[in-house]
Design a protein with these regions (language model features):
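Hydrophobic alpha-helical transmembrane segments
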Residues: 4, 8, 26-29, 61, ...
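Hydrophobic mid-bilayer segments of alpha-helices in multi-pass membrane transport proteins
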Residues: 4-15, 22-42, 61-69, 233-244, ...
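N-terminal alpha-helical transmembrane segments of multi-pass membrane transport
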Residues: 1-95, 203-218, 432
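Membrane-core helix-loop-helix motifs of multi-pass transport proteins
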Residues: 128-216, 391-433
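Alpha-helical transmembrane segments of multi-pass membrane proteins
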Residues: 95-109, 134-154, 176-184, 324-338, ...
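Long, contiguous bundles of hydrophobic transmembrane helices that form the permeation core
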Residues: 2, 7, 38, 177-278, ...
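Membrane-embedded alpha-helical segments and adjacent helix-loop junctions characteristic
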Residues: 43-132, 276-361
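Alpha-helical transmembrane segments
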Residues: 56, 60-64, 148, 186-199, ...
Length: 433
């Protein structure tokens, strides 16, 4: 029975526990145990695979803590306060303009300057006071940020999108359906369009009403007010730019963050004696999320070790018969479960392509329709997953004052506004392209 599959069972348990507001860290550990026990693994092997798998996100976790430290250090110079004032004057009291500006800025982090979530702990916490003044519902801001972290790599062959499209092209070609990497976007733009619809619904309909928040201090940060750009502020920006350049050249986000902190010390923007304070503040801001990413990698490792993903994918054949509509629907839903389980849309493609592409050929799907189904099946579950950086990133910035719930204010809104449109877009694309 498909409900007893370790992947399905553990994802359901994780979802229920998170919705009941159990800490995500504990929910992941319990879900990992459920997956292991359901697959008949000894408890020692389960914990061994959990711990061994954590290394998969070690660099990400270190990046989060160092980015938090950098964010606290930058905030201490007052440049964040100036940036907040500049953005406030730009949006001129219009919260919808702010949401769209942040969505566009977030998109740039995936292609124009591919730094992924690195900008969030630096840019978003200083803007919380402005959001409070505008009575902006932070659930809308979570949707804006997640849109920018997801839509560009799905729809555009630039930055992280080029990697995603390259994996799609390679796996499809390997399994009997040729498509050039540069042609993938000609199909996946449909999914991007449906995500834009989800974003607009979140901004203009679902979270349009005012929402009150208190002006509370930020975790690990002291408010530093500044009005005009001075020499130390320009040097701080120079250090931040250096971090991005080093990250782009070396491919190492931790190295970029360390370089920025070193530059700020050399420029005497921050003091040696304050480094401990910045580290403690960075851990306070990003520490929990870093640990969640570690445990999420361990959970994903257990899911893979059970062999249940292959069983789940293989079970599709017997479920759909010759129905094109049912086949597409099942492929999308199974993709959703797998991505929520292993935690990466990029990693889902190789797992499902070996079964999905022959199945698409059998059902008579076109190359374009198959691209859409495979891309949607992989991308589903990234938004809305409690352990995805597409949700943890936004929460890290929006919860800097402790007033933003990860599950109900980030995961649930982004799941509704992006996974449902992706399901619809994937189904329509598969059926009619």
């Amino acid at each position: 029975m498909i409900l007893l599959n370790p992947v399905v069972l553990s994802v359901i348990v994780m979802t229920v526990l998170c919705l009941l507001k159990l800490n995500v860290l504990l929910a992941l550990i319990i879900s990992a145990l459920v997956a292991g026990f359901a697959a008949g693994m000894p408890v020692g092997d389960i914990m061994g695979n959990l711990i061994n798998g954590m290394g998969g996100n070690a660099e990400t976790a270190l990046s989060y803590v160092l980015l938090g430290t950098l964010a606290v250090a930058i905030n201490s110079t007052g440049v964040a306060s100036i940036l907040s004032k500049k953005i406030a004057s730009l949006v001129d009291g219009k919260k919808k303009i702010l949401l769209i500006v942040i969505a566009v800025f977030s998109c740039f982090s995936q292609n124009l300057i591919p730094v992924h979530i690195a900008f969030i702990p630096i840019l978003i916490p200083p803007l919380l006071k402005l959001m409070n003044e505008l009575k902006l519902d932070r659930r809308a801001m979570a949707c804006s940020l997640t849109f920018g972290l997801k839509a560009p790599y799905i729809a555009l062959p630039v930055g992280f999108g080029l990697i995603f499209h390259g994996i799609l092209s390679a796996e499809m070609s390997k399994n009997g359906m040729e498509i050039a990497k540069t042609d993938v976007w000609k199909s996946t733009w449909v999914l991007g369009l449906f995500m834009i619809i989800g974003l607009l619904l979140a901004i203009f309909v679902t979270y349009n009403r005012d929402r009150e928040y208190k002006d509370l201090p930020l975790k690990g940060m002291e408010e530093v007010k500044a009005t005009n750009m001075e020499g130390r502020h320009w040097l701080t920006l120079l250090a931040a730019i250096a971090a991005f350049v080093i990250q782009l050249v070396t491919g190492s986000l931790p190295l970029g963050a360390i370089a920025a902190l070193a530059a700020m010390l050399v420029f005497r923007v921050i003091k040696w004696k304050d480094i401990d304070e910045y580290i403690n503040g960075g851990v306070g801001l990003m520490g929990l999320i870093a640990f969640i990413m570690l445990v999420a990698a361990g959970y994903g490792n257990i899911i893979r070790e059970t062999g249940a993903v292959t069983e789940l994918v293989d079970s599709i054949h017997g479920m759909i018969g010759g129905s094109k509509a049912l086949g597409i629907s099942v492929m999308l839903l199974v993709g959703l479960l797998i991505t929520m389980g292993i935690g990466t849309s990029f990693g889902t493609i190789p797992v499902v392509a070996a079964i999905y592409i022959p199945l698409c050929l059998k059902l008579g799907l076109s190359v374009e329709g198959s691209v859409i189904v495979l891309a949607a099946a992989a991308a589903l579950g990234d938004a809305g997953s409690p352990a995805s950086d597409s949700t943890l990133g936004p929460t890290s910035g929006l919860n800097a004052d402790g007033q933003h719930d990860h599950i109900w204010d980030t995961c649930v809104p982004t799941f509704i506004h992006y996974n449902i449109p992706l399901l619809i877009g994937g189904f329509i694309g598969g059926m009619f392209f």
